[in-house]
């Protein structure tokens, strides 16, 4: 029991480290344009991002549930706590390496791949929850394509609408909207990325028999 508790505490600690790294790795993307155009000061933008990420993390828990049960089956995991600990450390290392070399990367890709890889190394391919894992992989692949298409379409629409607009007035209005979009992006980041650590901690609690396995909802202290 002491071993289980120590590993579980380590997973919680490394999950918080992962969240911190994810913050300076990804959160800046939400406020970068608003700061660069001086729509927001750096201090205000950081405060806005922190508040909206926090609200987003508490609003929805769907992503946390996906991390908990859709990648691997927690009931089939042997040495499950070691698997989860190895996965979170691997994701942290990869995020740090890509940040150090200035390589754009996704914390989601890193964490999901790390969980799957650690589980397969420990127990083979049978431990994967193939229906859920396949769904996640498909979404990860098509997300950049969908974002590219939406970005192209939105730029074209905005260009047509503001083709003959007064440049000074348009810039002033765009700065106002950038405050809104920065807040919305930060909120979205909270509803997605902030929940990944919740999912990891919940998975660890279930594997350690510290949480009812029929409930994959993160408990309040995890949120």
Model-derived segments and spans:
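Multi-pass alpha-helical transmembrane bundle typical of ion/small-solute transporters
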Residues: 1-223
């Amino acid at each position: 029991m002491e071993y289980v508790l120590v590993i579980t505490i380590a997973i919680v600690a490394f999950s918080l480290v992962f969240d911190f790294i994810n913050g300076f790795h990804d959160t800046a993307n939400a406020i970068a344009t608003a700061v660069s155009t001086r729509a927001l000061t750096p201090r205000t933008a950081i405060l806005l991002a922190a508040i909206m990420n926090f609200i987003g993390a508490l609003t929805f828990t769907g992503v946390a549930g996906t991390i908990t049960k859709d990648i691997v089956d927690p009931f089939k995991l042997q040495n499950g706590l070691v698997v989860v600990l190895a996965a979170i450390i691997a994701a942290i290392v990869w995020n740090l390496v890509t940040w150090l070399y200035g390589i754009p990367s996704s914390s989601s890709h890193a964490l999901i791949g790390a969980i799957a890889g650690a589980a397969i190394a420990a127990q083979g391919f049978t431990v994967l929850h193939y229906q859920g894992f396949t769904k996640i992989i498909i979404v990860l692949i098509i997300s950049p394509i969908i974002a590219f298409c939406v970005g192209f379409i939105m730029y074209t629409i905005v260009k047509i609408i503001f083709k003959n607009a007064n440049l000074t007035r348009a810039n002033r209005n765009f700065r106002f909207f950038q405050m809104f979009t920065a807040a919305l992006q930060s909120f979205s980041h909270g509803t997605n990325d902030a929940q990944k650590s919740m999912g990891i901690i919940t998975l660890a609690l279930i594997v350690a028999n510290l949480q009812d396995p029929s409930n994959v909802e993160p408990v309040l202290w995890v949120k």
